[in-house]
Amino acid sequence: MAHKKSGGSSRNGRDSAGRRLGVKKFGGEAINAGGIIVRQRGTKFWPGENVGMGKDHTLFALATGAVKFVTKRDNRTYATVVPANEVMAAE
């Protein structure tokens, strides 16, 4: 009768899945209205022109166009969307 005493229990062994945070559309990339630009905890990036902020601080486009990141004198980085018609006019 080969027996083995039971091993002790461990208090480790739990971990939560990663939250998939970060920049989803980088500077110069095209984005549609409603598209997510940044998923973040807190305000690492702030909403600029044509960008809205959700209750979990997610930044999303309010207009179709190109994403642009701007650091202003207040030391905040703002995500802005240059509307598609303005992008065409600049070219």
UniProtKB/Swiss-Prot annotation:
Residues 1-21 are annotated as: Disordered. One of its GO terms (cellular component) is cytosolic large ribosomal subunit. SUPFAM superfamilies: Ribosomal L27 protein-like. Keywords: Ribonucleoprotein, Ribosomal protein. GO terms for molecular function: structural constituent of ribosome. One of its GO terms (biological process) is translation. InterPro entries: Ribosomal_bL27, Ribosomal_bL27_CS. Transmembrane segments: none annotated. HAMAP family: Ribosomal_bL27 (MF_00539). Belongs to the bacterial ribosomal protein bL27 family. This is Large ribosomal subunit protein bL27. The lineage of its organism: Bacteria, Pseudomonadati, Pseudomonadota, Alphaproteobacteria, Caulobacterales.
